[in-house]
């Protein structure tokens, strides 16, 4: 992963990707996974997202992994939580508080147990194409048999704008999750007033997927 790029974003507080409230896609489409309270949830590249709080209100165990130590510490500090911190290695820390378990370090090496449910809003689209296959292989290994993924992707002409966030078109989604049941829940096409279209993109769409193991 491009560690330095994201570390600099958090260090300089250039975090336009961070939403100050729960993502409406999560609240609208989480029920499509038919989630149960005792099912475990994994959120890759979670940042300090408010989505974690929403999920913890509905599940007993929410696990995240985030490269930036700044983001992980901010998540707990902003909520006045005092987590138990375990140093797992020189580059990996484990933060635990009530329903929350968050690893601070590399997604590819964090020892995360397979979960029933996965929520990926900003992880896959944060990675360049050459990293997405390896990322997805790891993600699939962290999903239990019968598990479900709620995935959010973007679709635009990558030649017209440099990521991140990157474009992950339908054909790539279907290739990455080949062998799994893939259902597109939504495709939201940007209109002429959308900031991305005003900046010159010929098209820009947000897509929501239900992926079942």
Curated annotation (Swiss-Prot):
It catalyses: S-adenosyl-L-methionine + a thiopurine = S-adenosyl-L-homocysteine + a thiopurine S-methylether. GO terms for cellular component: cytoplasm. S-adenosyl-L-methionine binds at residues 10, 45, 66, 121. Its main location: cytoplasm. HAMAP family: Thiopur_methtran (MF_00812). Gene3D superfamilies: Vaccinia Virus protein VP39. It holds the Pfam family TPMT. The lineage of its organism: Bacteria, Pseudomonadati, Pseudomonadota, Gammaproteobacteria, Vibrionales. It is an enzyme of class 2 (transferase). Belongs to the class I-like SAM-binding methyltransferase superfamily. TPMT family. It comes from the Bacteria. GO terms for biological process: methylation; response to metal ion. It comes from Aliivibrio fischeri (strain MJ11) (Vibrio fischeri). This is Thiopurine S-methyltransferase. NCBIfam families: PRK13255.1, TMPT_Se_Te.
């Amino acid at each position: 992963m491009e560690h330095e790029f994201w570390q600099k974003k958090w260090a300089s507080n250039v975090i336009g990707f961070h939403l100050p409230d729960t993502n409406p896609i999560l609240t609208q489409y989480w029920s499509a996974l038919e989630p149960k309270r005792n099912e475990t949830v994994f959120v890759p590249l979670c940042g300090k997202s408010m989505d974690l709080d929403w999920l913890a209100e509905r599940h007993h165990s929410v696990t995240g992994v985030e490269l930036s130590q700044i983001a992980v510490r901010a998540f707990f500090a902003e909520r006045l939580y005092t987590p138990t911190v375990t140093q797992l290695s020189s580059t990996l820390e484990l933060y635990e508080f009530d329903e929350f378990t968050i690893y601070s370090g590399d997604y590819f090496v964090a020892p995360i147990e397979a979960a029933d449910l996965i929520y990926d809003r900003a992880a896959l689209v944060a990675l360049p194409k050459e990293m997405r296959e390896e990322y997805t292989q790891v993600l699939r290994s962290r999903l239990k048999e019968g598990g479900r993924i709620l995935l959010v992707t973007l679709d635009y002409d990558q030649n017209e704008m440099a990521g991140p966030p990157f474009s992950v078109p339908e054909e790539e989604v279907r290739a990455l999750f080949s062998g799994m049941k893939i259902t597109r829940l939504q495709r939201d096409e940007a209109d002429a007033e959308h900031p991305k279209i005003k900046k010159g993109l010929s098209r820009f769409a947000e897509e929501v997927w239900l992926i079942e193991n």
